[in-house]
Swiss-Prot record:
InterPro entries: Ribosomal_uL14, Ribosomal_uL14_sf. SMART domains: Ribosomal_L14. It comes from Dictyostelium discoideum. This is Large ribosomal subunit protein uL14. The keyword Ribosomal protein applies.
Length: 136
């Protein structure tokens, strides 16, 4: 995660999207899905795949979508994940799909966000919170 641009408190979220995961695009930027190729801010351990969770910034490529977006490396934010995680109040939460939005390296979203967004992501990235329809 790019700590210089992210604001708010940092949450412990179960990491559900390893490198190589394909997630739906939750915005109207023209991409249909995003293929995770790297996770920002992961130090890691030898032979362990870096994984992303809700609120993490990832480097991704577009596998389906507009031709001008494909075959380029872009940055994205994970806004929903299927893997459950536990919140501080004891509630386990998960979504029905893995989804992310395309953004610039500062965390500013390129399009409008479709569908719900996790509270952990909206607290960390204020530009996501302003564009989100519903925050869960």
């Amino acid at each position: 995660m790019s700590k210089a641009q992210a604001v708010g408190s940092n949450y412990r979220v179960s990491l559900g999207l390893p490198v190589g995961a394909v997630m739906n695009s939750a915005d109207n930027s023209g991409a249909k899905n995003l293929y995770v190729i790297a996770v920002k801010g992961i130090k890691g351990r030898l032979n362990r795949l870096p994984s992303a969770g809700v609120g993490d910034m990832v480097m991704a490529t577009v596998k389906k979508g507009k031709p001008e977006l494909r075959k380029k490396v872009c940055t994205g934010l994970v806004v929903r994940q299927r893997k459950h995680w536990k919140r501080k109040d004891g509630v386990y939460i998960y979504f029905e799909d893995n989804a992310g939005v395309m953004c610039n390296p500062k965390g500013e979203v390129k399009g409008n966000i479709l569908g719900p967004v996790a509270k952990e992501c909206s607290d960390l990235w204020p530009k996501v919170a302003t564009n989100a329809g519903t925050i869960v």
